[in-house]
C-alpha cells in the first residue's frame, strides 16, 4: 500500500474522532446550559409561587341552586393546599403534637390541686376520650381527606351551625394558645437566670421564628415539627429512664411510693368532697394538655398519601398517651410531693415550677 493511501486512511479515521469529540463537547455544553436554565426557571418559579401565595385565590362563581353546605364543601375542596407532608412528618406530628406546656408545666398545677392519684385519674380518663376521638378522626380523614380539616366534618355530617361553632371555638383556642406558648417559652429562658430585659426580647424572637417557619410552607412546617417532636420525645424518654432509676434508689435512698402515704397523701383534701373537687379540677389542665392531638386530622389534607399514613399515625396515639403521659406522670407523682411550694399554683409560673424539673433538681440531678 502506498504512503498516500495510508495517509488517506489515517486522515479518514481522525475525522470521525474529531467529530465525536466536537459533538460530545457540544452535548456537554448544551446540557450544562440547559441545567442552568432549568435551575434559573425553578428559582424564578419558586419566587413567583412565594409571591402568589399572598394573593387571593380566584374562584369561579358557584351555582346558585346549590345548598350552603354544598357551596362550603366545594370552596373547601378548591383551597390551594399542597400535599407535601410525608409519612415521617405525620408520625412525629402524631407523637409530639400534644407534648408541650400542658404536660411539662401545667401538670404541676394538677399535681398540687389533685395529688398524685387525682393526677393519674384525671389524665387517664381524659386520655381515653382523646384515644377514641383521634381514632374516629383518623377514619374520617382516610375516608374523606378534605382540605378543611376536622371542623368541616361538623358541617358535613351534623349541621352548619354546629360547624360554625366548632370553627369559632377552634379559632379562639389558637388565638389564646399561641401567645400563651410564646410567653411560656420566654419564661422558660428565665430558668438560666436571664435578665428580665432580655426575657421580653425572647417573646419577639420566638414569634419571628414561628413566622419564618410559616414562610417555608407546609414542607417547612413538617420539617420543623419533625425536629421539635424528636427533641420533646428525647426529653420525655430521658426523664422516664432517669425517674425509674431515682425511684428505685440509685442515688442511695429508696423512694418508692413515699409521697402517696401519710403525711403527704395520694389526694388533696381532708374529706371525700375536697378530694373529689381536687380530682375534677385536673380535667381542666388535662384538656389543655391534650390540645394538639387533633393536628393529625388537620395535616391529613396536606399529606401525600393519607390513606396509608393516617391509620399508622392514629394507632400510635395509644403508645403516645401511655408512654409519654401516663408513665411520665406516674414518675412525677412518685418523685414530687403535691405540697411542694415550687409547683405552679402555689408560686410564680416559671420553668422551675415544672414538676419534671423539680423531680430532677430535688434529687441532685444538675446540668439542666
Regions found by a protein language model. Name each.
Residues 2-108, 112-116, 130-131:
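Membrane-interface "cap" regions at the ends of multi-pass membrane proteins
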Residues 108-110, 138-139, 143, 151, ...:
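Helix-loop junctions at the membrane interface of multi-pass solute transporters
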Residues 118, 228-231, 297-333:
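Junctions where cytoplasmic loops transition into the N-terminal start of transmembrane alpha-helices
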Residues 82, 92, 103-202, 212, ...:
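Extracellular loop-to-transmembrane helix junctions
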Residues 152-154, 159, 191, 266-269, ...:
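TM-loop-TM module centered on a large, flexible mid-protein loop between adjacent transmembrane helices
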Residues 91-99, 123-124, 128, 168, ...:
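Residue-level signature of the transmembrane alpha-helical core
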Residues 101, 105, 178, 235-236, ...:
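Hydrophobic alpha-helical transmembrane segments in multi-pass membrane proteins
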Residues 200-261, 291, 314-322:
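Membrane-interface loop-to-helix entry segments
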Amino acid at each position: 500500500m502506498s504512503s498516500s493511501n495510508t495517509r488517506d486512511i489515517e486522515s479518514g479515521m481522525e475525522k470521525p474522532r474529531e467529530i465525536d469529540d466536537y459533538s460530545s463537547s457540544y452535548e456537554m455544553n448544551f446540557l450544562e446550559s440547559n441545567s442552568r436554565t432549568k435551575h434559573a426557571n425553578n428559582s424564578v418559579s419558586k419566587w413567583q409561587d412565594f409571591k402568589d401565595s399572598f394573593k387571593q385565590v380566584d374562584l369561579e362563581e358557584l351555582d346558585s341552586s346549590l345548598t350552603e353546605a354544598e357551596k362550603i364543601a366545594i370552596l373547601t375542596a378548591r383551597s390551594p393546599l399542597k400535599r407535601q407532608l410525608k409519612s415521617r412528618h405525620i408520625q412525629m406530628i402524631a407523637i409530639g403534637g400534644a407534648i408541650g406546656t400542658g404536660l411539662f408545666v401545667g401538670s404541676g398545677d394538677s399535681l398540687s390541686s389533685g395529688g398524685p392519684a387525682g393526677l393519674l385519674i384525671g389524665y387517664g380518663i381524659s386520655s381515653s376520650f382523646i384515644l377514641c376521638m383521634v381514632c374516629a378522626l383518623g377514619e374520617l380523614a382516610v375516608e374523606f381527606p378534605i382540605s378543611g380539616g376536622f371542623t368541616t366534618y361538623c358541617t358535613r355530617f351534623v349541621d352548619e351551625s354546629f360547624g360554625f361553632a366548632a370553627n369559632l371555638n377552634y379559632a379562639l383556642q389558637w388565638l389564646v394558645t399561641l401567645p400563651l406558648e410564646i410567653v411560656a417559652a420566654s419564661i422558660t429562658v428565665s430558668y438560666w437566670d436571664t435578665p428580665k430585659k432580655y426575657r421580653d426580647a425572647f417573646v419577639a424572637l420566638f414569634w419571628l421564628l414561628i413566622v419564618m417557619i410559616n414562610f417555608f410552607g407546609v414542607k417547612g412546617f413538617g420539617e420543623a415539627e419533625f425536629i421539635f417532636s424528636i427533641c420533646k420525645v428525647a426529653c420525655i424518654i430521658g426523664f422516664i429512664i432517669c425517674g425509674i432509676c431515682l425511684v428505685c434508689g440509685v442515688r442511695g435512698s429508696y423512694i418508692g411510693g413515699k409521697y402517696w402515704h401519710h403525711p403527704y397523701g395520694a389526694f388533696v383534701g381532708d374529706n371525700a368532697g375536697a378530694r373529689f373537687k381536687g380530682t375534677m379540677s385536673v380535667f381542666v389542665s388535662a384538656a389543655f394538655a391534650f390540645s394538639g392531638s387533633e393536628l393529625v386530622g388537620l395535616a391529613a389534607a396536606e399529606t401525600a398519601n393519607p390513606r396509608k399514613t393516617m391509620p399508622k399515625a392514629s394507632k400510635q396515639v395509644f403508645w403516645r398517651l401511655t408512654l409519654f403521659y401516663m408513665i411520665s406522670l406516674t414518675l412525677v407523682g412518685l418523685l414530687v410531693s403535691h405540697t411542694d411550694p415550687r409547683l405552679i399554683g402555689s408560686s410564680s409560673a416559671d420553668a422551675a415550677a415544672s414538676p419534671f424539673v423539680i423531680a430532677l433538681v430535688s434529687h441532685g440531678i444538675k446540668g439542666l
